[in-house]
């Protein structure tokens, strides 16, 4: 498994678990959860974190000490203009060109606005950003985002923060089958089995926040998610046995003891 690296644009990672930084009770819990997860990519909502504050005790200081790749995101943006402006600000403040693009279309469900996401992605790719767009689990939208030049696609498994798990595994399978860029499941994971299923379907990674931060023991859940993502990836590479309607004996007929 050491050679099974994940490459997104010019970036390469050994961990396929991406995590967020919101909803923890304090910075110490955030730090311990991040360490337990083994994640190398940590996403930060630019609207909720002061990027200029980098002194001791700040979120940015914590992330820099952890030597992780910071993935700024545009959570809370409802227009193309806001999302693009937020990404430009992140780059101006010294963060990398790697961005998680979110353009929300509905306040209640937090579903993405597909048209706005495509438009914003087109602008950002032209400006040299490595764009990872949050999108619906729609194979057509994912294909269009890939055609624009996005370095990965991030279809949701279920609404953000819902914990409902993988609601449409078949769409994710189609996306994975047709996409030539990494597919990172983003949103909806509730527990370790959800993460394992996403990876078993062939997805290249999983991004989560509430599933860890909202657990009764976030540190233990972070460890569980780390193991689940790795186990799911290994199972996908190993190839599961075919499903059958009827039983198949695991012991051969030869050598069966005859009746006395």
Curated annotation (Swiss-Prot):
InterPro entries named in the record: Aldolase_TIM, Thiazole_synthase_ThiG, ThiG
Gene Ontology biological-process annotations: thiamine diphosphate biosynthetic process
EC number: 2.8.1.10
Listed CDD domains: ThiG
Family: Belongs to the ThiG family.
Chief location bin: cytoplasm
Name of this protein: Thiazole synthase
Pathway(s) per entry: Cofactor biosynthesis; thiamine diphosphate biosynthesis
Subunit structure, interactors included: Homotetramer. Forms heterodimers with either ThiH or ThiS.
Cellular component, GO annotation: cytoplasm
MF-aspect GO terms: thiazole synthase activity
Species this chain originates from: Sorangium cellulosum (strain So ce56) (Polyangium cellulosum (strain So ce56))
Chain sites annotated for binding 1-deoxy-D-xylulose 5-phosphate: 161, 187-188, 209-210
Function, as annotated: Catalyzes the rearrangement of 1-deoxy-D-xylulose 5-phosphate (DXP) to produce the thiazole phosphate moiety of thiamine. Sulfur is provided by the thiocarboxylate moiety of the carrier protein ThiS. In vitro, sulfur can be provided by H(2)S.
Substrates-to-products reaction catalysed: [ThiS sulfur-carrier protein]-C-terminal-Gly-aminoethanethioate + 2-iminoacetate + 1-deoxy-D-xylulose 5-phosphate = [ThiS sulfur-carrier protein]-C-terminal Gly-Gly + 2-[(2R,5Z)-2-carboxy-4-methylthiazol-5(2H)-ylidene]ethyl phosphate + 2 H2O + H(+)
């Amino acid at each position: 498994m050491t050679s099974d690296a994940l490459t997104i644009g010019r970036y390469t990672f050994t961990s396929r678990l991406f995590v967020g930084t919101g909803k923890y009770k304090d910075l110490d819990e955030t730090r311990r959860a991040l360490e337990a997860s083994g994640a190398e990519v940590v996403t930060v909502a630019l609207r909720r974190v002061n990027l200029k504050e980098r002194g001791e005790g700040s979120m940015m200081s914590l992330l820099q000490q952890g030597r992780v790749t910071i993935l700024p995101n545009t959570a809370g943006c409802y227009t193309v203009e806001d999302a693009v402006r937020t990404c430009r600000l992140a780059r101006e403040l010294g963060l990398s060109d790697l961005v998680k693009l979110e353009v929300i279309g509905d306040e209640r469900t937090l579903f993405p606005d597909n048209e706005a996401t495509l438009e914003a992605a087109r602008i950002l790719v032209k400006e040299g950003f490595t764009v990872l767009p949050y999108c619906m689990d729609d194979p057509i939208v994912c294909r269009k985002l890939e055609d624009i030049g996005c370095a990965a696609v991030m279809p949701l498994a279920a609404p953000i923060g819902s914990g409902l798990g993988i609601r449409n595994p078949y769409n994710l399978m189609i996306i994975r089958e047709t996409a030539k860029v990494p597919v990172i499941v983003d949103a909806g994971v509730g527990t370790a089995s959800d993460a394992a299923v996403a990876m078993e379907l062939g997805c290249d990674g999983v991004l989560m926040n509430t599933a860890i931060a909202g657990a009764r023991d976030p540190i233990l859940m972070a460890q569980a998610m780390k193991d689940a993502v790795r186990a799911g990836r290994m199972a996908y590479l190993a190839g599961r046995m075919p499903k059958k309607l009827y039983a198949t004996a695991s012991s051969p007929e030869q050598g069966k003891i005859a009746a006395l």
